[in-house]
């Protein structure tokens, strides 16, 4: 009987993995279906021109869908943006904060609000994409074959439906598959661009534009970078939490100690994404405008990839968003109050404000190290891309996303296997009894 249960659990895991792969194949298939009314030749020339702007970054996150202007051109980004906005508002807006405390019911309502906001943001972004496409003219002609009201309406509907479909696929993966669906959709998009980036690098090496030694060094550097990311993402500070003893009749319960882990990089991959978006926005606007003014030229030059001003601002913004997002993700006061509610305490710290201040003290130091780590991981590839013209798909943000998603998915698979074995063991014990 126990063997049958173990086999059933194993089959369930395999089915979940197959379901996840099937959903991701649908995502990749949709990224090659273009929206109607686009001249693909003219679009390719525009995509090549803007591959190092904000369009290049979002094209990387969408797995090339934006460059091909497919039905998934907006990718899952409107949903992520909506989720972050709702998360930010839940800190400042009291009704949303109260909704968070309602448990599973409140979580469902917040998810529903995120979906509504996703549709709204996707509609605005889709309309902006339609207007931008209509304004693009290349040597081969305009990007849009027949501009006008009908093109805008069909583009908005197509892109919004594409985003909703991706959002639904992500939710299905989370519920019925393995891993976080949204993260896996971004992951598969980034991974899809890696083979072409590797081929491009070795092609440059073959033609003599890039030294073979440098190409090998870059490959070794990538392996080291992945190892460093894994080390820092797994790094955590464990705080001792003590529970008081209590006597019930003649028996004494409690008194055990446990640990509260605080991640070194609490903010995750959000700071580099936000910092990149803000810095690349002015240069993208400059590339869209037809103005050849000195101001625009100077802006494009100083905020270009690998330039000292760009690197400095990039590091400053990463550090700022590291602190900002950590403060949102981890509420020191709320955590301290929860510990006090359950009678737990940090040894040597009084429950309440003293514990909250201690959390802030520890988190500040962790966030400084985490911010420096994120800055180094993101800046080194920027310098390499600027010097050796390596594809944006091998940027620091890409590495962070890919490694984090792989680690999270592996952890979930291990947890699933462990829980299956535990359930099988409990079932055997019950049968013996």
From Swiss-Prot:
Keywords: Cell inner membrane, Cell membrane, Membrane, Protein transport, Translocation, Transmembrane, Transmembrane helix, Transport. It is a multi-pass membrane protein. One of its GO terms (biological process) is protein transport by the Sec complex. The lineage of its organism: Bacteria, Pseudomonadati, Pseudomonadota, Alphaproteobacteria, Rickettsiales. GO terms for cellular component: plasma membrane. The central subunit of the protein translocation channel SecYEG. Consists of two halves formed by TMs 1-5 and 6-10. These two domains form a lateral gate at the front which open onto the bilayer between TMs 2 and 7, and are clamped together by SecE at the back. The channel is closed by both a pore ring composed of hydrophobic SecY resides and a short helix (helix 2A) on the extracellular side of the membrane which forms a plug. The plug probably moves laterally to allow the channel to open. The ring and the pore may move independently. The chain crosses the membrane at residues 17-37, 71-91, 117-137, 149-169, 184-204, 212-232, 268-288, 310-330, 366-386, 388-408. It comes from Rickettsia prowazekii (strain Madrid E). The keyword Protein transport applies. PANTHER family: SECY/SEC61-ALPHA FAMILY MEMBER. SUPFAM superfamilies: Preprotein translocase SecY subunit. Component of the Sec protein translocase complex. Heterotrimer consisting of SecY, SecE and SecG subunits. The heterotrimers can form oligomers, although 1 heterotrimer is thought to be able to translocate proteins. Interacts with the ribosome. Interacts with SecDF, and other proteins may be involved. Interacts with SecA. PROSITE patterns: SECY_1 (PS00755), SECY_2 (PS00756). Belongs to the SecY/SEC61-alpha family. It is found in: Cell inner membrane. This is Protein translocase subunit SecY.
